[in-house]
Design a protein with these regions (language model features):
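Residue-level detector of short, conserved catalytic/binding motifs and their immediate flanks
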Residues: 77, 127, 209
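A generic secondary-structure boundary signal that marks alpha-helix termini
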Residues: 7, 20, 135-138, 151, ...
């Protein structure tokens, strides 16, 4: 699905959760400067990942295809990651996908939507935290923070989860009180519900991560190639190739 004229210029001009309401149905700073490449190692009993994030700019742009990770190009195909920040594989996919977003600048619109497990309060609340940070122009910063600290907040007692997220909000430079209130705002919940409904009802997704191109699920993605050696450029290169193939683009097409 390409961008419609009705939704294609959806900067957060309205400022607060109200800006999100209009589109529910369908990192660095908010100044627009680019993120510095950062690297943080995270380990689990079976996994170690160094999150060497790419230098990409926070777009502060959302439309009915999700939150944009690269500059919107009118008429270009759209690829979307459906993510669950409580899933370790999703954290790895986020890293590869952000690198792909940078490589696809000017060729494809790269967006992300939420697909948290309906049975996990940790999954739901982490999605709400990213959405609340997005209102203050820090989608990427919060998403990256949750990926880097996943084992920490997933092991917290549920009653301490909001405290953890508020600590992260402070670390990435958010207005913590505003962040806390926004997490409980109905417009944020509505936006999350819209993502979940589209993933489950319309696309029949039962897991995360998943990818779509022009709103069609990519059935043949080899997730071993996405998730192995994710610190290297290889997974992103694989994703770029698969996304372009699904969109019917040659390797060199730019819009």
């Amino acid at each position: 699905m390409t961008q419609s004229s009705m939704t294609r210029r959806t900067l957060f001009a309205l400022g607060a959760p109200a800006a999100l309401v209009a589109f529910a149905a369908c990192s660095k700073s908010s100044s627009g400067t680019s993120n510095s490449t950062t690297s943080k190692s995270v380990s689990t009993p079976d996994n170690v990942v160094s999150f060497n994030w790419p230098e990409i700019t926070e777009t502060e742009l959302r439309d009915d295809t999700g939150y944009h990770l690269n500059k919107l190009v009118d008429g270009a195909p759209t690829v979307t990651l459906y993510n669950d920040y409580a899933v370790f594989e999703c954290a790895k996919a986020e890293l590869a996908y952000e690198k792909a977003a940078k490589d696809l600048e000017g060729t494809m619109n790269v967006t992300v939507r939420h697909h948290p497990s309906p049975n996990s309060v940790y999954a739901r609340n982490s999605a709400l935290a990213v959405l609340a940070a997005e209102v203050q122009g820090k989608h990427l910063a919060m998403a990256r923070k949750l990926c880097e600290t996943q084992e920490e907040w997933r092991r917290s007692a549920f009653e301490n989860l909001r405290v953890k997220f508020k600590d992260y909000a402070k670390e990435i430079g958010l207005d913590v009180d505003k962040f806390d209130k926004t997490m409980d705002d109905k417009s944020i919940a509505d936006l999350l519900y819209a993502d979940q409904e589209h993933a489950f009802r319309d696309l029949r997704m039962v897991r995360a991560p998943e990818f779509t191109v022009n709103d069609k699920v990519l059935e043949n993605i080899d997730f071993n190639k996405v998730l192995e050696n994710v610190e290297s450029s290889t997974p992103a290169e694989y994703l770029v190739k698969e996304f372009k193939k699904a969109a019917g683009l040659s390797w060199f097409v730019r819009f």
